[in-house]
Amino acid sequence: MILMIDNYDSFTYNLVQYLGELGEELVVKRNDSITIDEIEELSPDFLMISPGPCSPDEAGISLEAIKHFAGKIPIFGVCLGHQSIAQVFGGDVVRAERLMHGKTSDIEHDGKTIFEGLKNPLVATRYHSLIVKPETLPSCFTVTAQTKEGEIMAIRHNDLPIEGVQFHPESIMTSFGKEMLRNFIETYRKEVIA
């Protein structure tokens, strides 16, 4: 079962729909309507942190959940969720030089885990005004996708089953979004079984 922390974003249910189409069981909880103990009781196989209209500091239980469950269950963050992952581990989330709302970018990726078997570069849809500052990304992370300008578009933890994407895989304008989600689940389901 996947627990989706909903950061009050309209895109959350697009993610939920994609994951449902992949045959996954989902529980969705708003970021202010669940506690760490309640998450423990649900015993999810995966934790996903949704996009949202705010900063990581305003994302309810998202930061605490990432801290608590890092290394216990696979975690995937989208947009705000991605920024929250970086911040938990010591990265700085700052105002982007260019606001990206409903704009697409070609991103180059490393072809591993979530990007395995996907076209390179691929088109990613962006809706954000904040971004992870590249020089502050902790050394425990690898940048797995970026724009030609060097903006971080995806990260992967080097040792733990944690990944984040700055763009929106659930947007119809993003290439291979559903495949990325499938790749995440298939890659890290092994971690759940182990």
UniProtKB/Swiss-Prot annotation:
Keyword Protease applies: no
EC number(s) given by UniProt:
2.6.1.85, 4.1.3.27
Listed GO MF terms: 4-amino-4-deoxychorismate synthase activity; anthranilate synthase activity
- Keywords annotated in UniProt: Amino-acid biosynthesis, Aromatic amino acid biosynthesis, Folate biosynthesis, Glutamine amidotransferase, Lyase, Transferase, Tryptophan biosynthesis
Supply the PROSITE patterns for this chain: GATASE_TYPE_1
Key word RNA-binding present:
no
Q: Where is the Glutamine amidotransferase type-1 domain?
A: 1-194
Protein task: Part of a heterodimeric complex that catalyzes the two-step biosynthesis of 4-amino-4-deoxychorismate (ADC), a precursor of p-aminobenzoate (PABA) and tetrahydrofolate. In the first step, a glutamine amidotransferase (PabA) generates ammonia as a substrate that, along with chorismate, is used in the second step, catalyzed by aminodeoxychorismate synthase (PabB) to produce ADC. PabA converts glutamine into glutamate only in the presence of stoichiometric amounts of PabB. Also involved in the biosynthesis of anthranilate. Complements a glutamine amidotransferase-negative mutant.
The name this protein goes by in its record? Aminodeoxychorismate/anthranilate synthase component 2
Gene name per UniProt = pabA
